[in-house]
């Protein structure tokens, strides 16, 4: 003999009960169920199927009536019929006996469904009590009348275990705003007060006096309010700020091969909570339409309603519909944009908005420097609840709008704009193989960003090629250092300092040829060049060196300052003092031979080019240990000087003459002259001895065009 499982929900209790009746499912009646429960003061509502509305809760009072069965089980809701327990939205009539029986909203089926798209049964305005015209919670422009319940007109309710007022929405025709009463994480608050109306945050759309009078009336008529569950209360201000519109989109599937959406099912302890749009694939019908966005709730596909349907059933039905020919009609409840592109300039039409985590994280990262935007000065930025944009107390030197990007812009400028927090490129922490990749972005997003923000690309293929060049140049890097670009991979920004060889402090005037553009040789190890600290002028220690036979007689230089450009006099500073003394004039007279060597910088372009080629050939033949310091020597004829005077050392220091005393940075193995102090790192040298650390860093970041010759300011 078969048995029937009956799952029933009792009043406001969250956990349902299960009883087994020793009767086959096709023969079980209400009387059989009552015999097991023995609860005389309850009304019984059963899950059943209605031809017009689909799944409903039907009240059955006849003991001989057979109970509707779904998947071999009966689902029932037991509601107290004593008339003393009603929720905050129910209306107390003048006669207590006229109070309609409260209906329990319980979970387990279709939980998290906003109630405004659960149409109730058809009713007439004539049955309304006068007090329902200005309900204390429902706004005036969305009037939801009450009516007396009759068994033959079953109510279609669903929710999270609470007693709810009846309202006639007339199907989907007039109710387009979804109340967010079951969004568990945002819109609930607890209250243990006896006055149930105080559980509602009332909007200002009604007269406060009428609400107050009605509150006192209910307080007199209600001896005790039942304990309301957490999910039974909602804030009407949440409804006003998170107004979700229901839209219907008809897609023509003849033009597209696939629908192009992924769906996500939400579940909690009380059952499945709806089907949501997870992501939208490019090239599909949904992406081409553009109205459906990730985060929207899928309510209906064609004529199939997804309410009260489990996630598995909804997925199965959706697959069946997609495989059928013909247009597809999707009904969705719109959600706010989960990842706005212009999150910093998004107009705020309402004073209170839900917090956008994406905007929050990106702004916080920008302010704390998690992924710094090169070229921007620090700015104190604040976002207020009513502000429509970011206000800066310190003006930024380069905002994203200031970048005029084209295919002729250098890559550094484009990467600067791409790294800007306002660029629109989605840069955030990603998970890959359970590894967190900080500040990563997807290759396809880079291609799209380049195509839409950089002028000059004829098609997306060229933008993809440009992104590949960014990868090869090191401006973006693959997480595992792959050299081939793929739109499906995660990338991070490369170190811009590693590509500073293309930059200089000053612009070139174009008068020099390409042979003047030398690249920066490798810098020596920090310990390879000790800094003398006996004098305030900085210059390398002398080092014996035999020049290449093809070189002219070398001279000396005590230069100090940033090397800068060959054509910029202002960026060079000579170690000599213009205020000549008699002793210096005598020194100039003695060093007549070296003057000609010092003025060798006026040699023509051809001579300097050939000298560099000879030097490069000779350096390729020496060991690497010698190359590290030979590549940084100072040759007077390699510096184009616009001055007629000559560089001399600081006062009191005799100049070095001849090839054996060539100015060279000493390698690590060379010990300083007797009595010299030990070498120290630049960071530990006092500011008065290092002249200008900032100028030094600028010189390090901007290589000169003269084979690595640096002057320190």
Swiss-Prot record:
Residues 140-155, 580-593, 602-618 have a biased composition (Basic and acidic residues). Keywords: Cilium biogenesis/degradation, Cytoplasm, Developmental protein, Wnt signaling pathway. GO terms for biological process: ciliary basal body organization; cilium assembly; intracellular signal transduction; Wnt signaling pathway. Residues 421-495 form the DEP domain. Residues 212-225, 629-646 have a biased composition (Basic residues). Coiled coil: none annotated. GO terms for molecular function: beta-catenin binding. Residues 248-333 form the PDZ domain. Residues 87-235, 508-527, 545-652 are annotated as: Disordered. Residues 87-98, 118-127, 199-210, 508-518 have a biased composition (Polar residues). Its main location: cytoplasm. It holds the Pfam family Dsh_C. CDD domains: DEP_dishevelled, PDZ_Dishevelled-like. It is found in: Cytoplasm. It comes from the Eukaryota. Residues 173-189, 564-579 have a biased composition (Low complexity). GO terms for cellular component: cytoplasm. Residues 1-82 form the DIX domain. Involved in the signal transduction pathway mediated by multiple Wnt genes. Required during ciliogenesis for the docking of basal bodies to the apical plasma membrane. Belongs to the DSH family. This is Segment polarity protein dishevelled homolog DVL-3. It comes from Xenopus tropicalis (Western clawed frog). The gene is dvl3.
């Amino acid at each position: 003999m078969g048995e029937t499982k009956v799952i029933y929900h009792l009043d406001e209790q969250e956990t349902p009960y299960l009883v087994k009746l020793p009767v086959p499912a096709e023969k079980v009646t209400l009387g059989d169920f009552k015999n097991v429960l023995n609860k005389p003061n309850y009304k019984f509502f059963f899950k059943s199927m209605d031809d017009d509305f689909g799944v409903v809760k039907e009240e059955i009072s006849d003991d001989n009536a057979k109970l509707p069965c779904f998947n071999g089980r009966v689902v029932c809701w037991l509601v107290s019929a004593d008339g003393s327990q009603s929720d905050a939205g129910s209306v107390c009539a003048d006669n207590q006996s006229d109070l309609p029986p409260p209906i329990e909203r319980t979970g387990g089926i279709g939980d998290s469904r906003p109630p405004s798209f659960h149409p109730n049964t058809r009713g007439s305005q004539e049955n309304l009590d006068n007090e329902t015209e200005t309900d204390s919670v429902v706004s005036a422009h969305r009037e939801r009348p009450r009516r007396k319940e009759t068994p033959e007109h079953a109510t279609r309710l669903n929710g999270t275990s609470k007693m709810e007022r009846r309202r006639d929405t007339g199907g989907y025709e007039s109710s387009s705003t979804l109340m967010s009463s079951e969004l568990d994480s945002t819109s609930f608050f607890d209250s243990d007060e006896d006055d149930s109306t105080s559980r509602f945050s009332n909007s200002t759309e009604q007269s406060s006096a009428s609400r107050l009078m009605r509150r006192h009336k209910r307080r007199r008529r209600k001896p005790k309010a039942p304990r309301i569950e957490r999910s039974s209360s909602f804030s009407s201000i949440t409804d006003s700020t998170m107004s979700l519109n229901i839209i219907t989109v008809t897609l023509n599937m003849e033009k597209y091969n696939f629908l192009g959406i992924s769906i996500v099912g939400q579940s909690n302890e009380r059952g499945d909570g709806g089907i949501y749009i997870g992501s939208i694939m490019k090239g599909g019908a949904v992406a081409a339409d553009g109205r459906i966005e990730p985060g929207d709730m899928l309510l209906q596909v064609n004529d199939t309603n997804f309410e009260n349907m489990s996630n598995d059933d909804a997925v199965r039905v959706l697959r069946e519909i997609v495989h059928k020919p013909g247009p597809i009609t999707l009904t969705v409840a719109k959600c706010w944009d989960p990842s706005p592109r212009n999150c910093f300039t998004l107009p705020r039409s309402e004073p209170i908005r839900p917090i956008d985590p994406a905007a929050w994280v990106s702004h916080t990262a920008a302010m704390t420097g998690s992924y710094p935007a090169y070229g921007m000065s620090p700015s104190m930025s604040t976002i207020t609840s009513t502000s429509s944009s970011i206000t800066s107390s310190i003006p930024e030197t380069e905002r994203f709008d200031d970048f005029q990007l084209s295919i002729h812009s250098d890559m550094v400028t484009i990467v600067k704009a791409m790294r800007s927090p306002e660029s629109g490129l989605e840069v955030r922490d990603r998970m890959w193989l359970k590894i967190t990749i900080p500040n990563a972005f997807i290759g396809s997003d880079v291609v799209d960003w380049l195509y839409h923000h950089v002028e000059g690309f004829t098609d997306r293929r060229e933008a993809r090629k440009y992104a590949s060049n960014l990868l090869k140049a090191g401006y973006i890097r693959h997480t595992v250092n792959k050299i081939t670009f793929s739109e499906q991979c995660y990338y991070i920004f490369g170190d811009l300092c590693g590509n500073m060889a293309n930059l200089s402090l000053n612009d070139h005037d174009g008068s020099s040829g390409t042979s003047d553009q030398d690249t920066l040789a490798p810098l020596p190890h920090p310990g390879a060049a000790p800094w003398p600290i006996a004098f305030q002028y900085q210059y390398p220690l002398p080092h014996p060196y035999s020049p290449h036979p093809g070189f002219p007689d070398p001279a000396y230089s005590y230069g100090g300052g940033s090397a800068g450009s060959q054509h910029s006099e202002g960026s060079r500073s000579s170690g000599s003092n213009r205020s000549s003394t008699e002793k210096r004039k005598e020194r100039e007279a003695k060093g007549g031979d070296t003057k000609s060597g010092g003025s060798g910088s006026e040699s023509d372009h051809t001579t300097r080019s050939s000298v560099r080629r000879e030097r490069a050939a000779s350096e390729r033949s020496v060991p690497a240990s010698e190359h590290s310091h030979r590549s940084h020597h100072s040759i007077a004829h390699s510096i184009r000087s616009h001055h007629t005077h000559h560089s001399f050392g600081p006062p009191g220091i005799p100049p070095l003459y001849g090839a054996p005393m060539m100015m060279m940075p000493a390698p690590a193995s060379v010990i300083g002259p007797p009595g010299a102090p030990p070498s120290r790192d630049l960071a530990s040298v006092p500011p008065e001895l290092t002249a200008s650390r900032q100028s030094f860093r600028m010189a390090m970041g901007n290589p000169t065009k003269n084979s690595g010759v640096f002057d320190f300011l």
